[in-house]
Amino acid sequence: YLYSSTLKDCDWAYIHEGEHPVVELPTEPGFDDFSFFYFSYADAHTITCSYPAEYVYNMWKDAFDELANEGDKIMCLKLHPQLIGRSGRIRMLERLVLYMRQNGAWIAGCEEVARYVLAQNGKEADADAVAK
């Protein structure tokens, strides 16, 4: 694999050294749209768990501001098209991305970030590394 987001132990990317280096990209449940927008009548625990898009925008914006203030941090949003893709939510995401870009963020996918981290550390991804 090229990268992993399983450990949830920090706010920056780092490399698992070894024969095949793997980049650890930070994540947390609060950056997963599923945590806020999943809803199912079949699951009693989720019937009231869908949050307003504005609430999520403010939470993610505040987190971005703090990470940007600290510097050298990464904010990996985990987004599901069937959740974030709803009309009000996708507009919220567009607004958030615009805000982040206006404040100096580099918006990239996990594979691009992982390859950047490897290059910055003088390493190359294995030719057969899978972006997962």
Predicted regions located by residue number:
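Active-site-adjacent pocket scaffolds in enzyme catalytic domains
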Residues: 1-71, 121, 126, 131
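C-terminal domain-boundary segment and adjacent tail
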Residues: 57, 61-132
